[in-house]
């Protein structure tokens, strides 16, 4: 499921509800007993605990081998799939770039084998090649994905359904995908007294 909406509409709050960090002011959230949630946040400070490890060690620290798309993937193979050369995979975490830290976050999450994966702006700080590798990995993810992103291509590639948060506490299904949401935004901009220049593309997610 892809989640879109302007900044401040409540996208991150929805993710926090799903992972149990906040409670709803009305209604309730029901979670299955077998649900295992993992979240790719926009914060990389969680990697400070493994700063002294090498990248491949930080991945293997979660699991040595996982099954993805029906195939076994080792920690070393996971780093290669996410664009780390053998040399970079043996670089200490404290020495890698911001984009590499994001990739490491995702690899550690996937090695924990969740069945629900929440992604909050997962493409931040990633180059084109890494984006392609990440999309391939997410395509093979067997569980449920909930993705908040400004990247329209990513949403259309890795999610089957999109919904819009309208900023007033309501949620609308988008059978027409992200394009339907953009049309809604354009209609709102035209209908507003100020004209809202540039509003059509603001906060695609």
Please report, for each region that a protein language model flagged, where it lies by residue.
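ABC ATP-binding cassette signature C-motif
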Residues: 1-205
């Amino acid at each position: 499921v892809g989640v879109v909406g302007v900044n401040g509409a409540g996208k991150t709050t929805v993710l926090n509800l799903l992972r149990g960090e906040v409670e709803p002011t009305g209604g309730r959230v029901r979670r299955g007993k077998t649900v295992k949630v993992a979240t790719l946040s926009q914060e990389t400070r969680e990697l400070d605990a493994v700063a002294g490890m090498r990248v491949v060690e930080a991945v293997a620290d979660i699991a040595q081998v996982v099954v993805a798309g029906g195939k076994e993937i080792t920690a070393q193979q996971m780093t290669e799939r996410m664009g780390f050369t053998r040399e970079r995979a043996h670089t200490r975490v404290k020495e890698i770039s911001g984009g590499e830290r994001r990739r490491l976050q995702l690899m550690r999450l996937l090695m924990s084998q969740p069945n629900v994966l929440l992604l909050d702006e997962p493409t931040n700080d990633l180059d084109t090649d890494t984006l392609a590798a990440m999309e391939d990995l997410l395509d093979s993810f067997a569980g449920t994905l909930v993705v908040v992103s400004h990247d329209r291509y990513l949403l259309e590639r890795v999610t089957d359904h999109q919904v819009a948060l309208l900023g007033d506490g309501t949620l609308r299904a988008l059978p027409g995908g992200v394009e339907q949401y953009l049309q809604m935004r354009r209609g709102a901009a035209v209908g507003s007294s100020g004209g809202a220049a540039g509003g059509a593309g603001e906060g695609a997610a």
